[in-house]
């Protein structure tokens, strides 16, 4: 497909927005899903201060701004800010006119009906797109792995879902949601680093901790054993240089932080860990398809990028499942972007072209058309 008529694929996550053209193998634009507004009144005349900043620009000016995330736990909560993010995506990042391209958007599993209608309305009425479609994130991740049946454990910055999918259809009764994801792990790492005597408190410092988490954390295969190793030797210690040149050392925090995914009690939460949530999701499905789900457990999203997570998942699910069951955890290397990649694949299929909701259909039926055409 040529860029001039290619569909646009926009995956709006709680933490990052991924956008690009259908048919590409990676998103062209990846930026933080944040809108920043100045904390103080501007004093310099002619500075051309804006009343809001989006994405990387908001991130770089974070010292003078109040940062807001319009997507919380995977679901849009602030539509005015969301519109700003979409505007920024089309005009500043991709530099396209949205009225010339079909747009594929993604949504969280179990997204409220009113939300998808609102998305549809904004696309057609504010941005005048010729056609659009809304796809469920986890289903796209599964497509990206070349499957149509499996269970996806999708964990991003704001929310974690386990979504069983059979022959391309998500099974809503078996989808489970866990409000524990990347942002919570960053906050937890801030807390345990504070116990070490390092102080991280502001929203700007939180970004530094997020970087430490992404560069140094990993999942232990056996937590207790790893704790013992960390206590008896310094082999697990790593150092990290802060922006001001100070060097900090981090030891057992490296695996204590993501361990919270398996033991949410670390964060004071009473929910099950990701392994148990995945198992519970499978158990809510028909007994005949469970075998296919166990053998096709796909990890997706940035919070599944920790080294060691697939082996640990394999070990934990094997312990829960029937002893003869074949269990396979699929962790594609590009899983950070697999939702976007799945969208790119879907939107460029010739068989998909009749699935778009056109402007004409929208004008005839209104926003509720989205429930009839996107499932």
UniProtKB/Swiss-Prot annotation:
Show the InterPro entries listed in the entry: Actin, Actin/actin-like_CS, Actin_CS, ATPase_NBD
Q: How is it modified after translation?
A: Oxidation of Met-44 and Met-47 by MICALs (mical1, mical2 or mical3) to form methionine sulfoxide promotes actin filament depolymerization. Mical1 and mical2 produce the (R)-S-oxide form. The (R)-S-oxide form is reverted by msrb1 and msrb2, which promote actin repolymerization.
- Entry GO terms, CC: actin cytoskeleton; cytoskeleton; dense body; focal adhesion; nucleus; plasma membrane
* Molecular function via GO: ATP binding; hydrolase activity
Q: Which UniProt keywords apply?
A: Acetylation, ATP-binding, Cytoplasm, Cytoskeleton, Hydrolase, Methylation, Nucleotide-binding, Nucleus, Oxidation
- Chain positions with N-acetylmethionine modification: 1
Q: Which residues carry this modification: Tele-methylhistidine?
A: 73
What EC number(s) does the entry state?
Answer: 3.6.4.-
One family from Pfam that matches here is Actin
Q: Gene3D superfamilies from the xrefs? A: 3.30.420.40, Actin, Chain A, domain 4 (3.90.640.10)
Q: What is its main location?
A: cytoplasm
Family membership noted in the UniProt record: Belongs to the actin family.
Please tell me what else the database record remarks about this protein.
In vertebrates 3 main groups of actin isoforms, alpha, beta and gamma have been identified. The alpha actins are found in muscle tissues and are a major constituent of the contractile apparatus. The beta and gamma actins coexist in most cell types as components of the cytoskeleton and as mediators of internal cell motility.
Q: How does it assemble?
A: Polymerization of globular actin (G-actin) leads to a structural filament (F-actin) in the form of a two-stranded helix. Each actin can bind to 4 others.
Functional description taken from the UniProt entry: Actin is a highly conserved protein that polymerizes to produce filaments that form cross-linked networks in the cytoplasm of cells. Actin exists in both monomeric (G-actin) and polymeric (F-actin) forms, both forms playing key functions, such as cell motility and contraction. In addition to their role in the cytoplasmic cytoskeleton, G- and F-actin also localize in the nucleus, and regulate gene transcription and motility and repair of damaged DNA.
Entry protein name: Actin, cytoplasmic 1
């Amino acid at each position: 497909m040529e860029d001039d008529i290619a569909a646009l694929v926009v995956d709006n996550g709680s933490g990052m927005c991924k956008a690009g053209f259908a048919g590409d193998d990676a998103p062209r634009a990846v930026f933080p899903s944040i809108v920043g507004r100045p904390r103080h009144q501007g004093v310099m005349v002619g500075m051309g201060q804006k009343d809001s900043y989006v994405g990387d620009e908001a991130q770089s000016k974070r010292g003078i701004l109040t940062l807001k995330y319009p997507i919380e736990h995977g679901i849009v909560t602030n539509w005015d800010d969301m519109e700003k993010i979409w505007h920024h995506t089309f005009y500043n990042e991709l530099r396209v006119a949205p009225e010339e391209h079909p747009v594929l958007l993604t949504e969280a599993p179990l997204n409220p009906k009113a939300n998808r209608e609102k998305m549809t309305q904004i696309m057609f009425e504010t941005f005048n797109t010729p056609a659009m479609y809304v796809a469920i994130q986890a289903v796209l991740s599964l497509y990206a792995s070349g499957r149509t049946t499996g269970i996806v454990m999708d964990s991003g910055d704001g929310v974690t879902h386990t979504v069983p999918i059979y022959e391309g259809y998500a099974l809503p009764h078996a989808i489970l949601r866990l409000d524990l994801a990347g942002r919570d792990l960053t906050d937890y790492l801030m807390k345990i680093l504070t116990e070490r005597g390092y102080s991280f408190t502001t929203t700007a410092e939180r970004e530094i901790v997020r970087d430490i988490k992404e560069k140094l954390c990993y999942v232990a295969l056996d937590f207790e054993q790893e704790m013992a190793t960390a206590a008896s030797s310094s082999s697990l210690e790593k150092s990290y240089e802060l922006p001001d040149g100070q060097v900090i050392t981090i030891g057992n925090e490296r695996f204590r932080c993501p361990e919270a995914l398996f033991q949410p009690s670390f964060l004071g939460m009473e929910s099950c860990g990701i392994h148990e949530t995945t198992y519970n999701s499978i158990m809510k499905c028909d007994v005949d398809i469970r075998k296919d789900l166990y053998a096709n457990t796909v990890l997706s999203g940035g919070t599944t990028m920790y080294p060691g997570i697939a082996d640990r998942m394999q070990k934990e699910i094997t312990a829960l499942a029937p002893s003869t069951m074949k269990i396979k955890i699929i962790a594609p290397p590009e899983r950070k972007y697999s939702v976007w990649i799945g969208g790119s694949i879907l939107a460029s299929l010739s068989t998909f072209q009749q699935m778009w909701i056109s402007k004409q259909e929208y004008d005839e039926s209104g926003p509720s058309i989205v429930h009839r055409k996107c499932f």
